[in-house]
């Protein structure tokens, strides 16, 4: 498994994903089967086979690939205009099986091979967002103070993060910020902070740090706390993610 930071609240993960439990997270996820199909399970026990899927933030799901076929997942911040646009397109059922996904999946694989992770993500997310009427500047979609609050949470990890202090920093009441977060992103403020911590831990794991140390540095109270959040939001144990990163034939690195 390889991980790339793409900037603008985007993260890309590549590898073979199997045996994932149904889970949910604060990001909007775009899953691509680069050379073969994906198996998608939703919380209503619906099963789909496809090459390209978009999962709304907060939707319980599991996206898996054949062990011999590499898949790609792009995670978009729920407060970004791309995240909002794709969540809107997938909002009806929470899981959007993209029509004509084979064409876009093949084109994404080609973009990855030629231009690298950032080029592949820019191409695919741009194509998908082109199907939405969302404003590229995000105006009218995300409350500016909510965007500011989520950016603050992301930049504050692994320090202590609580709703009251973040609300005060963006001049909103805690109750209003909590409601706004749920209304506009589909996930609670606390789920957003747990997701940020998990991503922080994943970055440490990608650097080869032991699970316990990564959990501590990411701000989890202890190993069991990190384990619960990892199962909740990734569908696997931290040790499984660490093993997948270690066994990758290519090291994780920032996207070019």
Predicted regions: what is each one?
Residues 1-91:
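N-terminal regulatory/effector-sensing and dimerization cores
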Residues 111-112, 129-134, 149-161, 181, ...:
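Basic, amphipathic alpha-helical hairpins
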Residues 132-145, 179, 185-196:
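Short, Lys/Arg-enriched anionic-surface-contact patches
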Residues 175, 224:
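Key DNA-contact positions within bacterial/archaeal DNA-binding proteins
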Residues 80-145, 149-151:
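Amphipathic alpha-helical segments enriched in hydrophobic/aromatic residues interleaved with Lys/Arg
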């Amino acid at each position: 498994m390889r991980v790339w930071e793409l900037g603008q609240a985007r993260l890309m993960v590549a590898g073979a994903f199997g045996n994932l439990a149904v889970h949910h997270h604060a990001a909007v996820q775009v899953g691509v089967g680069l050379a073969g199909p994906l198996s998608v399970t939703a919380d209503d026990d619906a099963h789909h086979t496809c090459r390209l899927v978009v999962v709304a933030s907060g939707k319980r799901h599991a996206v898996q690939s054949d062990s011999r076929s590499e898949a790609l997942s792009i995670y978009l911040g729920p407060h970004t205009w791309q995240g909002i646009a794709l969540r809107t397109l997938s909002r009806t059922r929470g899981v959007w099986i993209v029509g004509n996904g084979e064409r876009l999946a093949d084109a994404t694989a080609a973009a990855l091979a030629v231009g690298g992770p950032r080029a592949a993500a820019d191409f695919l997310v741009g194509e998908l967002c082109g199907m939405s009427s969302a404003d590229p500047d995000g105006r009218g979609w995300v409350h500016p103070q909510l965007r500011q609050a989520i950016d603050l949470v992301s930049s504050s990890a692994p320090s202590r993060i609580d709703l009251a202090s973040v609300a005060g920093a963006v001049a909103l009441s805690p109750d209003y910020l909590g409601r706004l977060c749920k209304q506009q992103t589909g996930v609670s403020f606390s789920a957003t902070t747990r997701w940020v911590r998990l991503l922080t831990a994943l970055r440490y794991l990608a650097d080869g740090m032991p699970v316990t140390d990564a959990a501590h540095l990411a701000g989890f109270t202890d190993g069991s706390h990190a384990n619960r959040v990892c199962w909740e939001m990734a569908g696997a144990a931290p040790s499984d993610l660490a093993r997948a990163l270690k066994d990758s034939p290519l090291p994780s690195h920032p996207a070019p």
